[in-house]
Each structure stands twice: as structure tokens, then as C-alpha cells.
């Protein structure tokens, strides 16, 4: 349960920083704070990070943009997925859903809680579990993410 997690994981309440980030044109990649990954990894024991940069990889096995994690098999993996949050996120959510359904993967998605999007209604609502932290995620640089996060869990079809 993530309800008790916010105090332990240093939630963000910096409204000025949130507004500054929301109005910037920076890229849509957000590195997962290590505390959040560690907390989820205790429960899921991840084996694959399919969408990362070499310097942000959270698992021994990982795919970078050059490897194209969308084109790789995730069969029987325990996947931690923090995809780019731009227009491609729907493709990543489809991949997570399909790999759990068809290839025995357990996929935990660390994604914006964008309940008004097509990808949310097409894939996220089909997840085995959806968790919502109470507060926004705080970055290691002291800033915070400009949107609420959800942890979406697709379990393998048995």
C-alpha cells in the first residue's frame, strides 16, 4: 500500500517548482527516484528495465532507446517500466498490457495518473492493481514532478 509511503519517500509540496516544470518545454523523461524504485523492488524483485538510459537503468538487464524496448520480448520477466511521458506512452502501456497477457511478464508501470487519456482507458484500467501515492514525487535535486503518479501493475495471465 502506498498510503504510508509518502512520509518515508519525501513527498513534494513545492508548488512554485511544479508550475515552472509544467510550463517548460523540456523532454518527457523523468528518472525514477531511487527510493521509489527500492520500495517497489522489495515487493516485485525486478529483472528488466525496458526503457531507460544507461545512466538511469534500475536493473541489471535493461534496454535503451537504441535497443528499442518496445521491439524486445519481455517474456517471463519482472519488469519495472518508467516510460517517456510524451505521446509514445500509449505504445508503452500497450506493450506492458500485452506482455503480461501473452508472455507471462509481470509489469509495474511508474506513470502519470492521467485518467483522462485514451491509453489510461484502453490499458491502465485493465491492470490487476492501480496505486496512487498521496503526494507528488520528489526528485533527487529537490524539485518535484509536476503531475501525480500512479503505479500500475499488470500481472501475468495464469
Predicted regions and their residues:
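Class I S-adenosyl-L-methionine-dependent methyltransferase catalytic core
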Residues: 2-158
Amino acid at each position: 500500500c502506498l498510503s504510508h509511503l509518502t512520509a518515508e519517500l519525501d513527498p513534494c509540496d513545492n508548488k512554485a517548482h511544479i508550475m515552472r516544470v509544467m510550463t517548460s518545454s523540456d523532454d518527457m523523461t523523468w528518472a525514477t527516484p531511487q527510493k521509489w524504485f527500492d520500495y517497489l523492488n522489495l515487493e516485485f524483485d525486478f529483472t528488466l528495465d525496458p526503457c531507460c538510459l544507461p545512466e538511469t537503468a534500475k536493473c541489471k538487464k535493461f534496454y535503451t532507446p537504441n535497443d528499442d524496448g518496445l521491439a524486445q520480448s519481455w517474456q517471463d520477466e519482472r519488469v519495472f517500466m518508467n516510460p517517456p511521458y510524451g505521446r509514445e506512452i500509449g505504445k508503452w502501456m500497450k506493450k506492458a498490457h500485452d506482455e503480461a497477457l501473452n508472455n507471462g511478464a509481470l509489469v509495474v508501470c511508474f506513470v502519470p495518473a492521467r485518467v483522462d487519456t485514451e491509453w489510461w482507458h484502453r490499458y491502465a484500467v485493465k491492470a490487476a492493481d492501480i496505486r496512487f501515492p498521496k503526494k507528488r514525487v520528489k526528485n533527487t535535486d529537490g524539485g518535484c514532478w509536476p503531475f501525480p503518479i500512479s503505479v500500475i501493475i499488470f500481472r501475468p495471465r495464469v
